[in-house]
Amino acid sequence: MHFRSHRGGVYYTPENTMPAFRDALAQGFDVIETDPTLTKDGVIVLSHDATVNRCLRHPDGSLIEEQQRIRDLTYEELMAYDAGLIKGEAFRGTKVPTLEELFSAADGTDTVICIDKYVKWYDGEKLDALFALANRYNVKVSYLVETFEQIEKVQLRDPDALIDWDGLSDEETLKAVCAKVKYENLVVWLYMDKPNFAWLKEPLRKTSKENCARVKQYARLGISNVSNPSDVKEAFDFEPYIIEV
């Protein structure tokens, strides 16, 4: 069984920060999932949200009232905010990290860094910059995608890339995906059939005995964002290759 750390860790550490990533590396997670995005001046930083308001605070701990998008802030402007206080004083002074900081921390380890969102949002030179950064480090990287076009964008830059498929999982789609990606490079992700995933409307993308068996015919099975101990036990019963916690 393998384990992926969601945003580095969201329960005891501030998500998508170096304290979370260092903790995940120390615990020996097989994969760390993160969400790169770009500042106004082109620095690749790590944040799930497009805005700063949920996770960041002013240095005095107060909320950021005005909606601010990361893409509208320079890196220097972003560094004015605190990314740790959302989890308490122990993390005061934590800043939004760059992707390079995470690659540097994972350099030479067996931990895979899973890149979410970026391939969906960016193309051309902005995507080239991410691959160039990855190539400067001895780090394993996987790319989370949901369309065939996104697979092609990744493979154009790295033909042997690790792919996390987070799209449709009907039989026809799975056949097409595995025709593009080698079995050993592919994980197909399903979601637990729980209230917190009510937003997911495609029933074939939720865990069931039938859905999991279908995925395993074509790829390694991942179960995404398992959020409590009872759900972990339930996820184990599907015998996945990897679970995200």
Spans of features found by a protein language model:
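Phosphate-group recognition and catalysis centered on beta-loop-alpha active-site segments
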Residues: 1-245
